[in-house]
Amino acid sequence: MISTVSLFWALCVVCVINMARYYSSLRALLVVLRGCDPLLYQYVDGGGFFTSHGQPSKQVRLIGYIWAQRYLDHHDDEFIRRCQRVRGQFILTSALCGLVAIGLIGLAIWH
């Protein structure tokens, strides 16, 4: 029989891998954004997005922009495709993090 602890750790590994994929896709989106829409790139602080002095309010703007699907009216097809990918990975990663939290609570109750 499969151990619940090993299943939990496997879920954690899958979650971390998806977080890395999300981070990579977000970086690629910012590179595309810098080329196709410099004003939006500045609006979301693309240059300082992944730095320690990045502005969280501007980072939340980009996430809100993607979550509300405001990118659908954009003129660049590559940018639209990247935004759809980032949105899908955000939903997947959020769901996996929720499962990890539920699994951790379940393990705390069981053991």
Swiss-Prot record:
Provide the membrane topology annotation: Multi-pass membrane protein
Task: Provide GO CC annotations from the record.
Answer: plasma membrane
Main location per the UniProt record = membrane
**Can you say where in the cell this protein is located?**
Cell inner membrane
Any idea which UniProt keywords this protein has? Cell inner membrane, Cell membrane, Membrane, Transmembrane, Transmembrane helix
InterPro entries in UniProt: Universal_stress_protein_B
Protein's UniProt keywords contain Transmembrane: yes
TM annotation in the entry? 1-21, 90-110
Organism superkingdom: Bacteria
Has the keyword Transcription been applied to this entry? no
- Tell me its family: Belongs to the universal stress protein B family.
Q: What is this protein called?
A: Universal stress protein B
Q: Which organism is it from?
A: Erwinia tasmaniensis (strain DSM 17950 / CFBP 7177 / CIP 109463 / NCPPB 4357 / Et1/99)
Q: Gene encoding this polypeptide?
A: uspB
